[in-house]
Swiss-Prot record:
This is Methionine--tRNA ligase. A motif ('HIGH' region) lies at residues 12-22. Is required not only for elongation of protein synthesis but also for the initiation of all mRNA translation through initiator tRNA(fMet) aminoacylation. The keyword RNA-binding applies. Keywords: Aminoacyl-tRNA synthetase, ATP-binding, Cytoplasm, Ligase, Metal-binding, Nucleotide-binding, Protein biosynthesis, RNA-binding, tRNA-binding, Zinc.
């Protein structure tokens, strides 16, 4: 009987474009969904933008937009990525949609009715410069568990720990750089420490789902069991979860609690349900009928629910989320599938650090999206291991395996079928039938590997089968048979076997290469392939279409362009005058040893005043993290009023010998930029580091 599945990927935060890590996760889930549909199962594949939280509110304010406008603009840019890489979500929604507001408040009420919501006054970090309570993501410091520096206020990207912002060591505001102060605020908590929650999670995390499969990968359970197992004193790390934030906040207001909003991590996973409900409403054409269909679907014991996520958000999805669902009377996930990070040459992909492979650049260079789908699939397993992208390996796998082994089968046979036999397939001899039988026998194994998300193994088995087909071609040499008198029947037989084998291999590759498979279906003049169709043959009366080249090889120049930091600027044909950047030529090259002699430090301008007798200079009092402040003169009076600079961070040369000037001693030099021709482009601009830098930090 066909299965009915509800499949999601992690919701991307709506503060920027997709990076390649998003695309990898979507491709992984998309392959699994396509496999399920080829098996005859019904799947609802949904996702949404994660729209709430102070970071989006603050980002929107900076660009003069409402949060709603800001996230709408982000959402409008999703389609080129999804379409470009053939990712077939059935619905893309928003956590700010009406369905999410309704579901979040309903789940909260159910948890409250179950006695699992409490309130208490907590000390919360407050930014005295910005006059606001700081969201977790705008507090940084050292992880209280592993000591990693520059970690966010709610969880550690290094060890995965989840904690309260007040547990951070050496905290600072990411908005202003100041050390925040503690102020009291009443907060709402989900009582995860309740014995009922602990007992449920101990069972759920070790249990099997109705299909007899583990809900969590072994390595994932080994990670989260640290929260559940008592220590020598009988204490657990699993504490109550703070689910509220204070206004101003862009989010969903907590019922009967004016000025209090749900923490974004409470309503974000509920966005999975909201996206599904919104899909049913769209399918039904009206809200009432669609809502009923959603309720019926989720109440059906046969419905299976699966989440694909990255290993950095395990805790939210394997502890908080199932407990919220269970104690609000809702279905819990059948399984949570966790993958690792994508790395390039062993370096972690990170949007915040500005590193990685740009998906849109990949597409704009004319690179085939199915190259990337195939390559990532050859790396993806059921474990949450990191996926390594090597440009050299990428080119070798596509050119050698995909084109050289698989595509080559059709190209070696289709021409003879068309020219010598009018496009009609022939009768298959015993040796050809034996080869096709070998391919058919592997069907169950390959199906099981796709089901288990062992895509790398499924493709490895498929390419081993392609090797056997190519060995058959090399042994029979159709190009020589075509030259020999009386060998027409054998030529027809061999080429027919190749086409039949190519068709079966295409079925095995279809979840990974959907567009190519569709082109093959047209070329072979067949109905859409399923795994069941592998067990059949087309027969001697079947006619195929004309062969057209199905896939190009990767060009090394494309890969080189993909990983260039900046595309080279092509010179115009018309001669132009060479213009030096900033109005002056670059200085002579120096060695790293020379540069390392300069000690650049972050400095805070604690005071600034004009200099009597000078129209150019300002006197800056700088905090460089030392016991005493420094006095520095800077020729920036034409661009700044003293009060504009007080409290700002800048960069200074800290080891410059003190210089005696007419107005006093200048103990260092602050860095500022200006054009060489002040008359043509007036203005001098002091350098200011990003939020998070602290006085005394060295600039490397």
């Amino acid at each position: 009987m066909p299965r009915q599945l509800f499949v999601t990927t992690a919701l991307p935060y709506a503060n920027g474009n997709f990076h390649i890590g998003h695309i990898m996760e979507y491709i992984q889930a998309d392959i699994w969904v396509r496999y399920q549909r080829m098996m005859g199962n019904a799947v609802h594949f949904v996702c949404a933008d994660d729209c709430h939280g102070a970071p989006i509110m603050i980002a929107a304010e900076k660009v003069g937009k409402t949060p709603q406008q800001f996230v709408a603009d982000i959402a409008s840019g999703r389609k080129p990525y999804l379409d470009g890489f053939h990712i077939g979500f059935d619905n893309w929604h928003s956590t700010d949609g009406a369905e999410n507001h309704e579901l979040a408040q309903a789940i909260y009420r159910d948890l409250k009715a179950a006695g699992l919501i409490s309130t208490r006054v907590i000390a919360q970090f407050f930014d005295t410069e910005k006059n606001m309570f700081l969201p977790d993501r705008f507090i940084k410091g050292e992880c209280p568990k592993c000591g990693a520096k520059d970690q966010y206020g709610d969880n550690c990207e290094e060890c995965g720990a989840v904690y309260s912002p007040t547990e951070l060591k050496n905290p600072y505001s990411a908005l202003s750089g100041v050390t925040p102060v503690l102020r009291d605020s009443e907060h709402y908590f989900f009582k995860l420490s309740d014995p009922r929650c602990v007992e449920f999670l101990e069972q759920w995390t070790t249990d099997t789902n109705p299909r007899g499969q583990s809900r969590l990968q072994a390595e994932v359970y080994n990670k989260i069991k640290e929260w559940l197992l008592p220590d020598a004193e009988g204490k657990r790390d699993l504490g109550d979860w703070d689910i509220s934030r204070d206004a101003p906040y862009f989010g969903i207001e907590i019922p009967d609690a004016p000025g209090k909003y749900f923490y974004v991590w409470l309503d974000a996973p509920i966005g999975y349900l909201a996206a599904l409900k919104n899909r049913f409403i769209k399918l039904a054409g009206d809200a009432t009928t669609g809502a009923q269909h959603y309720d019926d679907f989720m109440a059906d014991p046969a419905t299976e629910q699966y989440h694909f996520i990255g290993k950095d958000i395990i805790t939210f999805h394997t502890l908080f989320w199932p407990a919220m669902l269970h104690f609000s009377g809702r279905k819990t996930p059948n399984a949570v599938f966790v993958h690792g990070f994508l790395t390039v040459n062993s370096e972690k992909m990170s949007k915040s650090r500005g590193t990685g492979l740009d998906p849109l650049k990949y597409l704009s260079l004319g690179m085939n999206p199915e190259w990337l789908r195939y390559y990532l699939a050859t790396k993806l397993t059921a474990r949450n291991e990191d996926v390594e992208f090597s440009p050299e390996d990428f080119m070798a796998r596509v050119n050698s395996d995909l084109v050289g082994k698989y595509i080559n089968i059709a190209s070696r046979a289709a021409g003879f079928i068309a020219k010598r036999f009018g496009g009609q397939l022939g009768v298959i001899s015993d040796d050809g039938a034996a080869l096709l039988k070998q391919i058919q026998i592997e069907r169950t194994s390959i199906e099981q590997l796709y089901e288990a998300r062992e895509f790398a193994k499924a493709l490895r088995e498929t390419m081993l089968l392609a090797d056997r087909v190519n060995e058959y071609v090399d042994a029979n040499k159709p190009w020589e048979l075509a030259k020999q008198t009386g060998m027409e029947t054998r030529l027809h037989d061999v080429c027919t076997v190749c086409i039949e084998a190519f068709r079966a291999l295409t079925a095995y590759l279809k979840p990974v290469l959907p567009l190519l498979a569709a082109q093959v279906e047209v070329f072979l003049n067949i109905e859409p392939l399923s795994f069941a169709s592998v067990s059949q043959t087309l027969g001697a009366v079947h006619r195929i279409g004309d062969y057209k080249h199905l896939m190009q090889r990767v060009d090394i120049k494309q890969l080189e362009a993909l990983f260039e930091a900046q595309a080279p600027v092509e010179p115009d044909n018309i001669a132009t005058e060479s213009v030096a950047p900033g109005g002056e030529g670059m200085a002579p090259v120096i060695s790293m040893d020379d540069f390392s002699k300069i000690d650049l430090r972050i400095a805070k301008i604690v005071n600034c005043e004009t200099v009597s007798g000078s129209t150019k200079l300002l006197r800056l009092t700088l905090d460089v993290g030392e016991t005493n402040t420094r006095n520095v003169f800077s020729g920036i009076a034409s661009s700044y009023q003293p009060e504009q600079l007080i409290g700002k961070l800048t960069v200074m040369v800290a080891n410059l010998a003190p210089r005696k000037m007419k107005f006093g001693i200048s103990d260092g030099m602050v860095l500022a930029a200006s054009h060489a021709d002040e008359k043509a482009q007036p203005g001098i601009y002091i350098l200011e580091p990003f939020a998070g830098a602290q006085p005394g930090m060295r600039v490397h």
